[in-house]
Amino acid sequence: MKVEVDSFSGAKIYPGRGTLFVRGDSKIFRFQNSKSASLFKQRKNPRRIAWTVLFRKHHKKGITEEVAKKRSRKTVKAQRPITGASLDLIKERRSLKPEVRKANREEKLKANKEKKRAEKAARKAEKAKSAGVQGSKVSKQQAKGAFQKVAATSR
């Protein structure tokens, strides 16, 4: 024998008793009597109606068994080395003072700037060298042998 539970009051519904209400979204509600069905349809909150099971649970009425608190395991963060950096190196970097960190960063930036400047100068020198060899500049159209406009001689 399957005993259902009232969707509103929480009361037991024995076979052959109660009514079934199917909402538009196909959710099924079972009611033990017209009283709980009526209150549900009025959109009353069962936690505020004194005789419902939900009210009794909410207001801690009657005998309730104390539910033992579930113990969750604390997560422990494990330090693992990153590819290309050992644990010692990571710890050393973390313990660096902000001033030292800032100085290192500025030093690296300066080195990068110098490197870029040197590359740019080398490129410029290369360009100047190749420009001297090429000689006079000829447009792409002339190089391809495009039709040359002949100047008018009648005037």
Curated annotation (Swiss-Prot):
Protein's cellular compartments: Cytoplasm
Organism classification: Eukaryota, Fungi, Dikarya, Ascomycota, Saccharomycotina
Protein name: Large ribosomal subunit protein eL24B
Phosphoserine modification, residue list: S7
Function noted in UniProt: Component of the ribosome, a large ribonucleoprotein complex responsible for the synthesis of proteins in the cell. The small ribosomal subunit (SSU) binds messenger RNAs (mRNAs) and translates the encoded message by selecting cognate aminoacyl-transfer RNA (tRNA) molecules. The large subunit (LSU) contains the ribosomal catalytic site termed the peptidyl transferase center (PTC), which catalyzes the formation of peptide bonds, thereby polymerizing the amino acids delivered by tRNAs into a polypeptide chain.
Misc note: Present with 36900 molecules/cell in log phase SD medium.
Family: Belongs to the eukaryotic ribosomal protein eL24 family.
Subunit architecture: Component of the large ribosomal subunit (LSU). Mature yeast ribosomes consist of a small (40S) and a large (60S) subunit. The 40S small subunit contains 1 molecule of ribosomal RNA (18S rRNA) and 33 different proteins (encoded by 57 genes). The large 60S subunit contains 3 rRNA molecules (25S, 5.8S and 5S rRNA) and 46 different proteins (encoded by 81 genes).
Bias (Basic and acidic residues): 89-129
Disordered: annotated segments: 66-155
Record-level GO cellular component terms: cytosol; cytosolic large ribosomal subunit
PROSITE patterns: RIBOSOMAL_L24E
Domain of life: Eukaryota
Main subcellular location of this protein, as a coarse class: cytoplasm
Organism, as annotated: Saccharomyces cerevisiae (strain ATCC 204508 / S288c)
UniProt GO BP: cytoplasmic translation; translational elongation; translational initiation
Entry annotated with the keyword Phosphoprotein: yes
InterPro entries attached to this UniProt entry: L24e/L24_sf (IPR038630), Ribosomal_eL24 (IPR056366), Ribosomal_eL24-rel_N (IPR000988), Ribosomal_eL24_CS (IPR023442)
CDD domains: Ribosomal_L24e_L24
One of the record's GO molecular function terms: structural constituent of ribosome
Keyword tags: Cytoplasm, Phosphoprotein, Ribonucleoprotein, Ribosomal protein
